Amino acid sequence: MGSYISVCCWRRHSIKDVHGNDINIAEDFEAFSEGEALLTEKTPTPPLPVYNDNFEDDE
């Protein structure tokens, strides 16, 4: 419910910096958004290392 209220308030009130200037989130935080290439890029996963936790075999 808190998230819903936060989104509603965000749409009605602009975000301001400490000097009272409006902040355009779409422009200022564009560098932090993920590109489509990153989301569709497929890389092979490396094999997992084999761990042996059986200490009785170690002598």
Curated annotation (Swiss-Prot):
Coiled coil: none annotated. Keywords: Host cell membrane, Host Golgi apparatus, Host membrane, Lipoprotein, Membrane, Myristate, Palmitate, Phosphoprotein, Virion, Virion tegument. A lipid is attached at residue 2 (N-myristoyl glycine). It is found in: Virion tegument; Virion membrane; Host cell membrane; Host Golgi apparatus membrane. GO terms for biological process: viral budding from Golgi membrane. Residues 40-59 are annotated as: Disordered. Disulfide bonds: none annotated. Signal peptide: none annotated. It comes from the Viruses. It is a lipid-anchor. Its main location: virion. Myristoylation and palmitoylation (probably on one or more of the nearby cysteines at the N-terminus) enable membrane-binding and Golgi apparatus-specific targeting and are essential for efficient packaging. Phosphorylated. Phosphorylation does not seem to be required for recycling to the host Golgi apparatus. Packaging is selective for underphosphorylated forms. GO terms for cellular component: host cell Golgi membrane; host cell plasma membrane; membrane; viral tegument; virion membrane. Belongs to the herpesviridae cytoplasmic envelopment protein 3 family. HAMAP family: HSV_CEP3_gammahv (MF_04042). Plays an important role in the cytoplasmic envelopment of tegument proteins and capsids during the assembly and egress processes. Also participates in viral entry at the fusion step probably by regulating the core fusion machinery. Interacts with cytoplasmic envelopment protein 2; this interaction is essential for the proper localization of each protein to the assembly complex and thus for the production of infectious virus. This is Cytoplasmic envelopment protein 3. It comes from Alcelaphine herpesvirus 1 (strain C500). The lineage of its organism: Viruses, Duplodnaviria, Heunggongvirae, Peploviricota, Herviviricetes. The gene is 38.
